[in-house]
């Protein structure tokens, strides 16, 4: 009750005989919780350098009443107040006031069931760093150590910074003195800062270093992998027996195992065993907890004039090798880290199936990731007279792709170079819906995609707490018209491409232009994750895309365009190869013309906070700001015409269902050109994707 602000709670315990047994008693607990008491004001005294307002801001968990602040209550909790007092003194020490202390603090209960906190502070004088000498170092010289320490003579004294630059407990891969030794074999090293003298306002230090003996990794083992085969794990482990010990390799191993997606990233624990300073060896055992890696979807219903059914599954830890092993089907053969996905969907007017397979480790020590996919889609026209599908009017799209990706070593091994060759075949018969510029004909799309990406996000791929990702990709077809020299500038004057009345036959012209699609597409995505405080994470993201043509006479293709706005969930029915770009706060695809955009940009700032990160379900809340728009050319591009929005939402990730979520977003701008009224509120449901 006191943690909820009921400081005057009273509890009385009474016992009465129990009629059931002679030796039994009933206990009655009478609780009078009283009124909730909130902090009315926080008063400081003795502070001369920093204002009351500044010091109140350093009390992270103890806040006085403030109208409109809903995210932090003004209740008083003893433990939180004690922690805040320590933070307050640390703030003074960071600014050079080493002797700062809280002389006294008191609580005054007011008549209106509120309280006043009074804090009396003695700031003391400001100190500065004097001489900083290194003692005991032989591996690194003084200059190298000073570069890492980052503190110079004459700097304002900062005990918190000094401690952090020697060993940062909150950041395992920090650039500090301890990690300098730990990352280069000196597991048994120890570093201590000792104050040797204080002259007036100057403090002199010695950094005493015991380098110890070089250490090597001895036995490396894993436990807890009940489904995943050992070889899948060991190929990701950076700590090798016989190699020099490196803390950085241990941290990187934890990150790589978490990125696999097969284990609970919050429970990956490297356990140091048999640490022997005499022999200079250490064993490491990685403790793992398997997480679900399969998603199955079976749906059925009636709507749109007929039965709608879909079936799909995605197995992220599949094993082709165990296909013939009947005992391995539980419900799928698992353990080799492969990804297998299959989806079937059928209605009266639409049927589609797709298959994809990814082998993440094709080859030996320098492997490639191999991927392949197949898909086929048929869409029939709706007959308004019969209410049924007219199978004489249809569109069919068949596609396949094959890809290779390789992790690079330069600039660093967070980089990946991927390449994909894709072919799509479009067959249209009497399909005059406006989706394509021609309703009879065929089109072929043979393209090559190359992408350079870097991903150094921290361990948990569902909720990264640091790091960044970026991808720069280019998608290209052959410049057929430049190779063949075919002239598309004057097709309208050719009688073959004219209607009987002499007017240009636009559909026939477009069929000639786009029988083999000719284009290039450039895209960029950059995402950064920054820890604000504790588990509060800021995600910032920027996206850009451009679709261009080699031959201006042939023009831009009606396929592969960008459609901006909404939840981004219409990819399944993107029949013309369009890319649906989510921008919350606006209706789906409302920020592009009917024909789509050739250019788009988008910016996102999103605050995330986890509610739970358990293997069974990861849940986090978010609030965001977004802006972006679609354009028809670079000449029309104007970043000041971006459509802005803000909102909040929640994400739930369950291994069996993938990512689910809902967002409530307010669009601040109009989707109708020339109008200024805001679009207003939109609700977006998120299934199986992440922004």
Where are these regions (language model features)?
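Periplasmic polypeptide-binding modules associated with outer-membrane biogenesis and secretion
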Residues: 1-302, 306, 315, 323-354, ...
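Gram-negative/organellar outer-membrane beta-barrel architecture
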Residues: 4, 8-10, 20-21, 38, ...
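Outer-membrane beta-barrel domain signature
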Residues: 16, 77-79, 106-108, 163-167, ...
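C-terminal outer-membrane beta-barrel translocator/porin domains of Gram-negative envelope proteins
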Residues: 277-278, 294-303, 434-611, 623-624, ...
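Secondary-structure transition into beta-strands, especially the periplasmic turns and strand N-termini
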Residues: 408-415, 530-538, 614-616, 658
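In a subset of proteins, long, contiguous C-terminal domains/tails are tracked
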Residues: 493-494, 503-506, 519, 528, ...
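Hydrophobic alpha-helical bundle architecture
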Residues: 606-614, 637-638, 651
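Outer-membrane beta-barrel transmembrane domain signature
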Residues: 628-645
């Amino acid at each position: 009750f006191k943690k909820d602000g009921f400081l005057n709670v009273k509890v009385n315990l009474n016992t009465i005989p129990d009629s059931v047994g002679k030796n039994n008693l009933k206990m009655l607990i009478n609780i009078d919780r009283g009124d909730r008491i909130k902090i009315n004001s926080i008063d400081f005294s003795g502070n001369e350098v920093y204002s009351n307002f500044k010091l109140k801001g350093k009390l992270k968990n103890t806040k006085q009443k403030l109208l409109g602040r809903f995210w932090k209550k003004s209740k008083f909790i003893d433990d939180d107040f004690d922690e805040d007092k320590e933070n307050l003194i640390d703030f003074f020490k960071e600014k050079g006031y080493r002797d700062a202390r809280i002389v006294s603090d008191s609580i005054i209960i007011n008549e209106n069931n509120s309280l006043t906190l009074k804090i009396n502070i003695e700031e003391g004088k400001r100190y500065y760093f004097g001489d900083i000498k290194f003692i005991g170092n032989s591996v690194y010289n003084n200059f190298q150590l000073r570069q890492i320490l980052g503190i110079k003579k004459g700097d304002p004294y900062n005990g918190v910074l000094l401690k952090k630059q020697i060993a940062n407990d909150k950041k395992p891969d920090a650039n500090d003195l301890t990690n300098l030794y730990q990352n280069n074999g000196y597991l048994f090293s120890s570093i201590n800062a000792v104050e040797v003298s204080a002259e007036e306002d100057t403090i002199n230090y010695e950094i005493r270093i015991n380098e110890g003996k070089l250490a090597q990794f001895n036995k490396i083992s894993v436990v807890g992998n009940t489904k995943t085969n050992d070889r899948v794990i060991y190929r990701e482990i950076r700590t090798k027996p016989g190699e020099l010990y490196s803390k950085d390799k241990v941290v990187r191993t934890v990150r790589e195992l978490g990125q696999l997606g097969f284990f609970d990233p919050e429970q990956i624990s490297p356990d140091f065993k048999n640490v022997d300073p005499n022999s200079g060896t250490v064993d490491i055992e990685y403790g793992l907890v398997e997480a679900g890696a399969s998603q199955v979807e079976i749906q059925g219903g009636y709507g749109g004039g007929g039965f709608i059914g879909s079936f799909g599954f995605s197995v992220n830890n599949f094993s082709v090798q165990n296909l013939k092993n009947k005992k391995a089907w539980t419900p799928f053969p698992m353990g080799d880290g492969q990804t297998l996905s299959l989806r079937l969907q059928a209605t009266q007017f639409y049927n589609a199936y797709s298959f994809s397979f990814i082998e993440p480790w094709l080859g030996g020590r320098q492997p490639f990731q191999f991927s392949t996919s197949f898909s086929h889609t048929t869409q029939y026209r709706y007959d308004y007279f019969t209410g049924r599908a007219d199978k004489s009017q249809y569109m069919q799209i068949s596609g396949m792709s094959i890809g290779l990706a390789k992790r690079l070593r330069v600039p660093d091994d967070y980089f990946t170079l991927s390449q994909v060759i894709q072919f799509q075949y479009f067959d249209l018969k009497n399909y005059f819906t406006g989706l394509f510029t021609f309703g009879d004909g065929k089109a072929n799309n043979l393209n090559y995609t190359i992408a350079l990406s870097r991903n150094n996000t921290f361990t948990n791929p569902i909720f990264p707490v640091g790091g960044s990702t970026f991808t720069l990709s280019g998608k290209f077809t052959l410049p057929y018209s430049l190779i063949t020299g075919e002239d598309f500038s004057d097709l309208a004057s050719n009688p073959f491409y004219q209607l009987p009345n002499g007017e240009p036959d636009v559909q026939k012209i477009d069929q000639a232009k786009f029988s083999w699609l000719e284009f290039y597409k450039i895209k960029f995505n950059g995402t950064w994750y920054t820890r604000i405080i504790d588990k509060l994470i800021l995600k910032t993201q920027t996206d850009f895309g451009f679709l261009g043509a080699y031959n201006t006479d042939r023009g831009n293709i009606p396929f592969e365009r960008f459609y901006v706005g909404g939840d981004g969930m219409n990819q399944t029915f993107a029949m013309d190869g369009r890319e649906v770009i989510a921008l919350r706060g606006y209706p789906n695809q409302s920020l592009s013309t009917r024909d789509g955009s050739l250019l788009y940009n988008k910016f996102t700032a999103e605050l995330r906070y986890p509610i739970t990160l358990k293997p069974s379900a990861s849940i986090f809340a978010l609030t965001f700001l977004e802006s972006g728009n679609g354009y028809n050319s670079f000449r029309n591009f104007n970043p000041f015409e971006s459509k802005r929005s803000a909102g909040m939402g929640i994400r739930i990730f369950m291994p069996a269902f993938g990512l689910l979520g809902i967002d409530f977003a307010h669009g601040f701008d109009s989707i109708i050109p020339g109008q200024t009224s805001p679009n207003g509120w939109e609700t977006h449901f998120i299934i199986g994707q992440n922004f």
